[in-house]
């Protein structure tokens, strides 16, 4: 009975890892759509989001079934409760990539971003994908040391977010209010994507150690 239980727990981790991978791919494609005003790619991200939503629902259901039927305690209870919380975090990562793609679609055929901030968003996209990949790795490996490193990787996103705001607040900004709103929203989407990846890492640490960093 316990063997079957631990197999189900392992399957749940694999499903969470798959969700992280899909969220990372979605953000990578959404960033390309944003930078290149690529409507086809934006539409692909939007249509593919259903995969993450389906996996999210299945993972959450699996976790609650384990919780209800197995009455886990101690480490097993931590693992399931953390998994339920991770489902929500990873689901939000996918939703944030979806938001980026929708802005790219809404502004098409124009570019949503002024050319002078493209470099910031190219780098924010790179960091976001890296964080998504790292989150996938620690969800599958349950490695608390690697999970702790993700919090450091997030510093790069925070720095980019701050620097971008100095550009927006500069008197030399000449792209108008609508562009400033888009840039602000998009920057926030990338920052929140990174924050949720960090939350996933924190929950992996809690699963492994019982201490919440």
From Swiss-Prot:
An example Gene Ontology CC term for this record: cytoplasm
InterPro entries: P_transport_PhoU, PhoU-like_sf, PhoU_dom
Gene3D superfamilies named among the record's database cross-references: Phosphate transport system protein phou homolog 2, domain 2
One Pfam entry name: PhoU
Effect of inactivating the gene: Defective in persistence phenotype shown by increased susceptibility to tuberculosis (TB) drugs rifampicin and pyrazinamide in both minimum inhibitory concentration (MIC) testing and drug exposure assays. The MICs of rifampicin and pyrazinamide decreased 4-fold and 2-fold, respectively. Reduced persistence in the mouse model of TB infection. Mutant was less able to survive and persist in the mouse lungs and spleens as shown by an about 10- to 30-fold decrease in colony forming unit (cfu) counts compared with the virulent strain.
Superkingdom, taxonomy of origin: Bacteria
GO molecular function: protein homodimerization activity
Predominant cellular place of this UniProt entry's protein: cytoplasm
Compartment(s): Cytoplasm
One Gene Ontology term from the biological process aspect of the record: negative regulation of phosphate transmembrane transport
Keyword tags: Cytoplasm, Pharmaceutical, Phosphate transport, Transport
Subunit-structure text: Homodimer.
Physiological role: Plays a role in the regulation of phosphate uptake. In this role, it may bind, possibly as a chaperone, to PhoR, PhoP or a PhoR-PhoP complex to promote dephosphorylation of phospho-PhoP, or inhibit formation of the PhoR-PhoP transitory complex. Important for tolerance to antibiotics.
Recorded family membership: Belongs to the PhoU family.
The protein, known as: Phosphate-specific transport system accessory protein PhoU homolog 2
Organism the protein comes from: Mycobacterium tuberculosis (strain ATCC 25618 / H37Rv)
């Amino acid at each position: 009975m316990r063997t079957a239980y631990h197999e189900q727990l392992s399957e749940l981790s694999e499903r969470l890892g798959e969700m992280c991978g899909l969220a990372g791919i979605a953000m990578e494609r959404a960033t390309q759509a944003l930078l290149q005003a690529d409507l086809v790619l934006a539409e692909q991200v939007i249509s593919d989001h259903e995969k993450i939503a389906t996996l999210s629902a299945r993972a959450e259901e699996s976790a609650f079934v384990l919780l209800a039927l197995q009455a886990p305690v101690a480490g097993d209870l931590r693992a399931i409760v953390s998994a339920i919380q991770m489902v929500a975090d990873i689901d939000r990562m996918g939703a944030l990539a979806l938001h980026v793609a929708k802005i790219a679609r809404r502004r098409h055929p124009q570019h949503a971003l002024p050319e002078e901030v493209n470099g910031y968003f190219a780098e924010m996209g790179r960091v976001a994908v890296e964080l998504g990949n790292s989150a996938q790795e620690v969800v599958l490996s349950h490695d608390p040391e690697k999970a702790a490193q993700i919090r450091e990787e997030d510093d790069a996103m925070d720095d980019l977010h701050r620097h971008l705001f100095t550009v927006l607040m500069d008197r030399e900004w000449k792209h108008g209010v609508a562009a400033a709103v888009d840039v602000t929203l998009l920057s926030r989407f990338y920052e929140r994507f990174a924050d949720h990846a960090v939350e996933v890492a924190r929950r992996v640490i809690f699963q492994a150690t019982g201490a919440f960093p």
